[in-house]
């Protein structure tokens, strides 16, 4: 068994893929200790991405698996397929336009083994070709989070110490098998459906302030452009609704209802609107009303929470829902958001 499987979804990726590849094969843990799974997500570059992946496989046939999808499934679908092939003790995810420090896998693996962690979360740099690496600006305190009771998990869940992105973490493979989580497919912002449920299954999470990952900031990036469109903004909400529906089927839903509700209402409604605001894009009133309709159907007690004091901005929105938000009300709220 390899120590770590690293999954890399690729779509028309030849511009940055070589740098990503070299950062992985030069890992100080040793190429023989890792399994790299590259997935060509139905690239449309005339076979250029696939040809490059074939070259990688020929160079390291014992450590590289390449998969070619006939249908574009976006990053979530590509990762789901790759997980079916992964054999490593731990799992990591790297995007094809990003790269990692050469000690990334060795240090995170050693810390995972030393602490018997289910999840290791680490820090990252932003990266552009013009500026190089830029500190993320996150102020993180290293911590070992042990969860052995319901009250401890509740406290952890509202602490927001763990982010919902997938690539700044190392995961115990057995944890993923136990949780049966998967990524949302054919959408952007696919990661929460995979990451959020894991927080209910993990019993030990290690937070590091060491940065190993270089997250490329690309103006042509999928997320940045797509979130300016109402159709793809809806994908964000749909993924959060999928998280809610997943959690309803778990044994955790009743015991952690307040925490799951807090997460769902924040991400499905408030965060969807806030993301649009950040991108200078105002969705239509009809778009908002569809979100509101789902909230009323799924969470009739949306305005009642033991955590109300923690979310004043969200509570303003919830109060306006209760009063019957008109189109003029929505425009006014948007200006204040």
Give the location of each predicted region.
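Cell-envelope/extracellular polymer assembly enzymes that use nucleotide-activated donors
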Residues: 3-5, 35, 193
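A conserved hydrophobic helix/loop-capping motif in glycosyltransferases and polysaccharide synthases
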Residues: 4-16, 20, 27, 39
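Acidic donor-binding segment of Leloir-type glycosyltransferases
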Residues: 21-68, 113
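Glycine-rich, basic loop-to-helix element that forms the pyrophosphate-binding segment
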Residues: 69-86, 96
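Short aromatic/hydrophobic "clamp" motif used to bind/position activated sugar donors
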Residues: 91
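Donor-binding/catalytic cores of nucleotide-activated saccharide
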Residues: 96-208, 215-231
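Membrane-interface aromatic/basic loop that binds lipid-linked glycans or pyrophosphate carriers
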Residues: 117, 276-337
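Catalytic core of nucleotide-sugar-dependent glycosyltransferases
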Residues: 212-219, 225-252, 271-300
């Amino acid at each position: 068994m390899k120590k770590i499987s690293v999954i890399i979804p690729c779509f028309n990726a030849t511009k940055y893929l070589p740098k990503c590849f070299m950062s992985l094969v030069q890992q100080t843990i040793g190429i023989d200790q890792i399994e790299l799974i590259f997935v060509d997500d139905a690239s449309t570059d005339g076979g250029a991405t696939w040809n490059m992946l074939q070259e990688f496989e020929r160079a390291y046939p014992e450590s590289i698996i390449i998969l070619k999808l006939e249908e574009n499934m976006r990053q979530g679908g590509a990762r789901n397929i790759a997980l079916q092939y992964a054999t490593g003790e731990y799992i990591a995810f790297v995007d094809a336009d990003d790269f990692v420090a050469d000690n990334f896998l060795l240090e995170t693996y050693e810390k995972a083994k030393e602490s018997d962690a289910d999840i290791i979360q680490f820090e990252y740099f932003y990266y552009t070709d013009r500026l190089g690496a830029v500190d993320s600006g996150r102020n993180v305190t290293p911590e070992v989070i042990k969860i052995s009771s319901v009250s401890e998990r509740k406290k952890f869940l509202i602490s927001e110490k763990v982010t919902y992105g997938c690539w700044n973490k190392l995961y115990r493979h057995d944890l993923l098998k136990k949780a049966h989580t998967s990524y949302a497919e054919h959408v952007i912002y696919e990661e929460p459906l995979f990451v959020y449920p894991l927080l209910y299954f993990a019993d030990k999470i290690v937070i590091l302030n060491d940065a190993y990952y270089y997250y490329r900031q690309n103006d042509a990036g999928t997320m940045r452009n797509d979130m300016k469109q109402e159709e793809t903004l809806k994908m964000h909400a749909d993924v959060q609704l999928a998280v809610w529906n997943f959690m309803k089927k778990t044994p955790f839903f009743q015991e952690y209802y307040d925490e799951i509700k807090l997460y769902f209402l924040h991400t499905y409604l408030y965060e969807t609107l806030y993301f649009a605001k950040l991108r200078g894009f105002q969705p239509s009133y009809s778009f908002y009303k569809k979100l509101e309709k789902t909230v009323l159907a799924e969470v009739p007690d949306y305005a009642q929470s033991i955590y109300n004091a923690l979310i004043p901005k969200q509570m303003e929105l919830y109060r306006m829902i209760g009063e019957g938000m008109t189109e003029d009300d929505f425009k006014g709220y948007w200006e204040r958001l």
